[in-house]
Amino acid sequence: MIARALADALARCGHSPHLVITPDYGFGRLTSTYRASWTTDVMTIDGCSIDRVVSLRYPSFAVRHPHHVCWLNHTMREYYDLWPRFAASISWRNRVKESVRRQTLHAVDGWLLHRNVTRVVAQSKTIQQRLAAAFDIRTEVVYPPPPLGSYQCLGYDDFIFAVSRLDPLKRVDLLIRALAELPARHVNAVIAGDGECAGDLQALARSLGVANRVRFLGRVDEPTMLDCLARCRAVCFTPYAEDFGFVTVEAFASRKAVITCRDSGGPTELVVDDGSGVVCEPTAASVAIAVARLVDDRVLAERLGSGGAAQAATMTWDRALEQLLSV
């Protein structure tokens, strides 16, 4: 999504962007994935000479160009900040094998980020801190602005909206559990996205007796997502240690407050508690209090949504491009 938004912004500013998707051969074929990026030709595309390269995620920073800015959104987190969690989930034999792979990956990533790119820019302070800890790289932060979409506010209906991949790190279950803490209130949730936890989340809603108050949309197209953002009371985005989280700025652009958690990483850098959303503890009870405040007080939801919109207005693509292209 960020790559497409960046390409659209470059085109709007008079540049001629080429969006190149580097190969990804999956978790078990990292060597092939890195080699494919290293050998991807970005010097000329369709007969055009390329003046600048902006890479985003691992291992696209392995492509080679003399004017190469890495605007990093994440490395392979299982081998970095999520290593303790990942290591605990595998057998000791696999842990030995993966430890060697992790050390190799750190060495390769460190060399590429120090030697293969002209400049490294982080998409959040959370990423900036990880880069400093892993590679002793000092970076500036350029937050991705909202995509150039049709964001609008069509009201503040009585539902909380959540949109993300449905995997454990996104902690969508916190919203479902929060609804169970609020049986006396007419609070509904709409959840968009798919992933490995989809079935478990639906089963959780049934077991807690809130299945009639949670609507699972599955994976949705952009118009449906924009409509939900435009009409919801607020957005609930409570991941664990998120790199950045585009959902936050999309909610702000729709004049909607964001509920997030103190350990959510990137979103907590943008959400101002009681200014553009609510920052709570990563517990169902704490999320329930935040949901109740916004559902019971529409004026508060509107005020915090306005605060988010004011923040989004300062995050422009013109400014981001000026920072990224100053190689």
Task: Please give the residue ranges for each predicted region.
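A short, well-ordered alpha-helix in the C-terminal region of glycosyltransferases
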Residues: 213, 293, 300-314, 323
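Conserved acidic donor-binding segment of nucleotide-sugar-dependent glycosyltransferases
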Residues: 262, 273-285, 293-298
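Active-site donor-binding segments of glycosyltransferases and PAPS-dependent sulfotransferases
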Residues: 13-60
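Membrane-proximal helix-turn-helix segments that form the acceptor-binding/catalytic region
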Residues: 89-120, 128
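Aromatic "clamp/platform" in nucleotide-sugar-dependent glycosyltransferases that forms part
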Residues: 240
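Conserved donor-binding/catalytic core segment of Leloir-type glycosyltransferases
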Residues: 150-170, 176-181, 190
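Short alpha-helical donor nucleotide-sugar binding micro-motif in glycosyltransferases
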Residues: 219-220, 227-232
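Nucleotide-activated donor-binding/catalytic signature segment of Leloir-type glycosyltransferases, i.e.
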Residues: 202-220
